[in-house]
Design a protein with these regions (language model features):
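Helix-turn-helix
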Residues: 9, 17-51, 55
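Short hydrophobic clusters on alpha-helical segments that form packing/core surfaces
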Residues: 10-18, 89, 184
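Hydrophobic alpha-helical connector segments
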Residues: 55, 59, 69-98, 150-154
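C-terminal peripheral helix-coil segments that are non-catalytic and often amphipathic
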Residues: 91, 127-135, 156-157, 163, ...
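Amphipathic alpha-helical segments used for helix-helix packing
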Residues: 94-113
């Protein structure tokens, strides 16, 4: 149990360093130094820097996938599902901004198998989001705009929210959700 806890501490420290410096610029020695231990000691808990990156990104991708699956099962309108997806992104941003930085910027540095798994999860997520948008258009809940433009506009904003949110200090999460949903939806309703 202690090993798992220590591994989680290592991953948390590394994710902060990855966000600050970028994955490529961070060494195992940097991670160890930030934790106040010797680099060799890290290998008792992890295989290497790439494993940390994979755990960060794949765990986050699974969280997005799980959230999407829960939203798809809801008996809500497409518009309500889009609102829930925006809220999902905000919740993840507020709680895991460091991991989001790695997911957005460093996913291509994972092992090939992990990259492939990530790409499948990302493409499935985007396809589900696209389907919800198309249903909203077909039901007249959304303006008849190109679904790709709507998807790109929403996801581009949400994927970079972690950069903006950190710079603005602690905003009330409920206020952020209310305003972000209103701003993004008004442009497509």
């Amino acid at each position: 149990m202690k090993t798992t806890s220590r591994k989680a501490e290592i991953i948390a420290e590394a994710s902060q360093l990855f966000k600050e410096k970028g994955y490529s610029a961070v060494t195992v020695r940097d991670i160890a130094q930030a934790m106040g231990i010797k680099a060799a000691s890290l290998y008792n808990h992890i295989e290497g820097k790439q494993e940390i990156l994979s755990v960060l990104i794949l765990d986050l991708a699974k969280e997005f996938t799980s959230g999407m699956n829960a939203i798809l099962k809801m008996n809500n309108s497409p518009l309500q599902k889009i609102e829930k997806l925006i809220e999902l992104h905000i919740d993840i941003t507020v709680n895991q901004s460091e991991a989001l930085a790695a997911l957005n910027n460093d996913w291509m540095h994972m092992a090939e198998t992990d990259v492939n798994n990530f790409v499948v999860m990302r493409e499935t997520y985007e396809e589900n989001f696209r389907t919800i948008i198309k249903e909203g258009i077909a039901q007249g809940q959304l303006q008849p705009r190109h679904p790709e433009v709507i998807l790109f506009s929403i996801l581009s904003t949400l994927r970079t929210l972690y950069l903006w949110y950190q710079k603005r200090g602690k905003l009330d999460v409920n206020l952020l959700k209310r305003d972000m949903v209103a701003v993004l939806i008004r442009g497509i309703v």
